[in-house]
């Protein structure tokens, strides 16, 4: 593994050293586990005690952070971003080894760039394309007419179905499926004389995954009924997410695990959806919208709004409702007592109840 002096790391991430810049570091580790030859980072005050007790040779911190006496630190504007860049230096991305494994299946009409790597039991179908320096792990299937761009990594058992397109520098984690059939059925009460049935609507569109996207393990992006389901540039989608047919996910959006987006909904740029949030179909979710975990979005959301709850409402109102809910039992008791008191007062005054 490579090693760097603290001064070299500072130059790479645009930081300032406080302490020994000549200190040589050979790895990065959590505060609790880092040794004197490793660097760590501190950006969450929950871990203040771990920071103070850490044996790390150096720690990445932000400009205003208070530092124990004698602690060597690297001050940067954004500690988490600097951590990511330093971690990449110590653990660089895997590079393709230009080869096609003997047990891989490449159709004669497929075009696989000579610099790409196709591992055992991967399959590239008729008229499919795999770009320069891309890596296909074992069990990957790139179907008929599908396209995978340059510098992509498709991990084990990824499926890119027919006519779907994956851009450049895309990462698809294990089990990800691009272009599965959308969930479309028309109810036929007669069933051509065989009784009622759900008649399958052909899903003849495709999926386009733009550049610099990452999709998590076992995430599914359904092909459009007609046209294109699109994942915008730089979007990052976690494990076990379901994107339905004809959905448009805007650039730089973040969808956390188990989010579900129903058909034909459009997400703007930079939308963030917390884990297990559900969004019904045919909605417009504006740029920069934030959706709380486990929310159920059932109406359009304007750009810049933050919503929570089910059905989702503006976050501030939801917080007030949750605060009231905690006291609901006591409020009910108080109301019951007040009603009894009113009844007693009416009885004393000789009034009839309304």
UniProtKB/Swiss-Prot annotation:
Gene3D superfamilies named among the record's database cross-references: Hexapeptide repeat proteins, MurE/MurF, N-terminal domain
Entry-linked InterPro entries: Hexapep (IPR001451), LpxD (IPR007691), Trimer_LpxA-like_sf (IPR011004), UDP_GlcNAc_AcTrfase_non-rep (IPR020573)
Keyword DNA repair: no
Catalyzed reaction equations: a UDP-3-O-[(3R)-3-hydroxyacyl]-alpha-D-glucosamine + a (3R)-hydroxyacyl-[ACP] = a UDP-2-N,3-O-bis[(3R)-3-hydroxyacyl]-alpha-D-glucosamine + holo-[ACP] + H(+)
CDD domains listed in its UniProt record: LbH_LpxD
HAMAP family: LpxD
Function: Catalyzes the N-acylation of UDP-3-O-acylglucosamine using 3-hydroxyacyl-ACP as the acyl donor. Is involved in the biosynthesis of lipid A, a phosphorylated glycolipid that anchors the lipopolysaccharide to the outer membrane of the cell.
Protein name listed in UniProt: UDP-3-O-acylglucosamine N-acyltransferase
Name of the gene encoding the protein in the UniProt record: lpxD
């Amino acid at each position: 593994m490579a090693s760097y002096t603290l001064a070299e790391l500072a130059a790479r991430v645009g930081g300032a050293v406080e302490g020994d810049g000549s200190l040589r570091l050979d790895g990065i580790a959590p505060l609790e586990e880092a040794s004197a030859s490793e660097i760590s980072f501190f950006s969450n005050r929950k871990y203040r005690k771990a920071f103070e007790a850490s044996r790390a040779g150096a720690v990445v911190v932000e400009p205003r952070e208070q530092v124990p006496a004698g602690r060597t630190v690297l001050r940067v504007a954004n500690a988490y971003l600097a951590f990511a860049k330093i971690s990449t230096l110590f653990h660089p991305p895997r590079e393709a080894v230009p080869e096609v494994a003997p047990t891989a299946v490449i159709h004669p009409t497929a075009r696989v760039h000579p610099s790409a790597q196709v591992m055992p039991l991967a399959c590239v179908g008729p008229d499919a394309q795999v770009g320069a320096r891309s890596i296909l792990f074992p069990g990957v299937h790139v179907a008929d007419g599908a396209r995978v761009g340059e510098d992509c990594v498709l991990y084990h058992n990824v499926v890119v179905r027919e006519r779907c397109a994956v851009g450049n520098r895309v990462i698809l984690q294990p089990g990800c499926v691009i272009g599965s059939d959308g969930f479309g059925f028309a109810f036929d009460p007669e069933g051509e004389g065989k009784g009622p049935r759900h008649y399958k609507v052909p899903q003849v569109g495709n999926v386009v995954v733009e550049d610099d996207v990452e999709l998590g393990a076992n995430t599914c992006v359904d092909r459009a009924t007609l046209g294109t389901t699109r994942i915008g540039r730089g979007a990052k989608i976690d494990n076990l997410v379901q994107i339905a047919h004809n959905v448009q996910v805007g650039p730089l959006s973040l969808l956390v695990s188990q989010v579900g987006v129903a058909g034909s909904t459009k997400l703007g740029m930079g939308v963030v959806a917390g884990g297990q949030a559900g969004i019904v179909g045919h909605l417009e979710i504006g740029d920069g919208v934030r959706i709380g975990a486990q929310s159920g979005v059932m109406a359009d959301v304007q750009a810049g709004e933050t919503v929570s709850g089910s059905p989702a409402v503006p976050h501030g109102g939801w917080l007030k409702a949750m605060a009231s809910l905690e006291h609901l039992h006591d409020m009910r008791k108080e109301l019951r007592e007040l009603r009894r008191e009113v009844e007693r007062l009416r009885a004393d005054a000789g009034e009839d109840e309304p």
